[in-house]
Structures are given as structure tokens and as C-alpha cells.
Amino acid sequence: MRKKDQPKLWLCLYLPNLALEVFYPSRAKQMLSDDLKPIAIIQQQRIEALSYHAAATGLTVGTMASHAYALCETLICIEKSASKEHRALEQIAQWLYEFTPNVSRYGDQHLILEVSSSLKLFSGLNHLKHLIEEKITHLGYTPKIGVSQTPLAAKISAEIDCPDNHQQSPGVALKALQLIHLQLPSPSVTKLEKMGITILKQLIELPRHTLKKRFGETFIHYLERLLGAVSYTHLTLPTTPYV
């Protein structure tokens, strides 16, 4: 009898402070500490990211820059640079080829690595994660890592600091996760909550045809990608270096 194929293992590298750190990568930790002037990254005159000290003043993401200056006279505003962020992700992806040939960009702050075949070479998942975190921190960036059996579950795990439950399927590992953390459309979450559905376990227990009728094909496809029922076609794993 053939042994059942082992599921692939995906590691998501999330860089929540990338918009700030691309300007001062070698001073990232200092810049985010509370002993420097408050710094905000703005786009179209709205705050998109805040340093630690800026956030401590009560400023929030989405605040208009003009209003922010009134609340914090010492605020330093820097225009967002999508090109710097893109180049930084490209550079980081190149460095990550040290650990796996399967590296892909996943949005503006994430990189996805398929690490199933890397575990033995790097003495297990914990050691591999440590090496990646050490490498990225040394480069001047603040990493958060999530690991799961699907790219989407790994991404969500990284963003919410979910413990590694990679030996379980996402439907089991994330079963207690609140719907608000699944990155579903807000109207869908509101409608589900009115039905008494607030966590992933309750959601996946509902008949698929009922969900499709109420929320549409796109909703079902997203849920199946999260759970691993279908492959994630939007994620391309290059066979040549990330450029």
C-alpha cells in the first residue's frame, strides 16, 4: 500500500513594519523604539504606518496628515515608497534562496516559502525558523513568521501570531479562530455573525451549497484555498531566482 502523500509545508514571512524600515533598514530597531522622534509613513495625505513613538502619542493609521500634525507637533512624515518596498522584498527573496528554491511574493508585506524539503537540511522547522528570523533581523527588518499546510493559512498565522500547528490541517489548527481574522469581506462576516457563526469551526461545518448560495462562488473558493481543498493558483513558485 502506498504511503499517503505528506502535505506541503508553507512558511510565511510577514514584514509588518516594512513601510518604515525601508527608509532606515540598518536603524530599524532604533527607529521603532520610543527614544526617537515620532515617524509616520503617509500615502495620499493619510497615515499608513507609525513608529512606536508615533503610535504612543495616540495617532492611528488612517488619520489625515494635517490632523496628525495638530495632535503631534514633532511628527516626522515620510511619503510612502512602494518602489523601495518592492525592491526590499526582491532583495529579501534573493537571500531566502539560501533556505529553499521555492520563494514567492504574496502581497506587499509577505513572502511565502515552501519548506517541506528544507527541514532535514536545516535540522528541523524550529531551527529553520530561527535561521530565517536571525537573517532578516540582521538585514534590519522586523519579521513575523507563520507556518501551515496552505499558503493562506500560513499568511493568516503570521499576521495574528498564531502558534505553529503545522502538523494539523488548517481546519483543525485554526478551528477556534474568529472570523474577523480570516480576512473575509466585512459584509460576509457580519452576515455570518448574525447567523451565530463566529469561528472557523462553525463555518466549515455548514453545508458548502448553503454557503455558496448565500455568499457566492468566490467565497467558497477562498475557503477551500485556506483549508487546502484546492491549490492556490495565484501563488507562483519560480524555478529561477526571484527578480
What are these regions, as identified by a protein language model?
Residues 115-117, 147-149, 186-188, 196, ...:
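Short, structured patches in soluble enzyme cores that scaffold and shape functional sites
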Residues 10-12, 28, 72-75, 189, ...:
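DNA-contacting surface of Y-family translesion DNA polymerases
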Residues 144-155, 172, 181-184:
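Extended compositionally biased segments used for macromolecular assembly or nucleic-acid engagement
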Residues 1-112, 117-119, 126-134, 143-147, ...:
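Residues that scaffold, gate, or flank divalent-cation-dependent active/transport sites
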Residues 234-243:
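Single conserved hydrophobic/aromatic residue that forms the stacking wall/gate
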Residues 152-175:
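Long, highly charged, low-complexity intrinsically disordered interaction regions
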Residues 175-185, 229-235:
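C-terminal extensions
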Residues 118-123, 163-165:
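Short, charged/polar, Gly/Pro-enriched secondary-structure boundary elements
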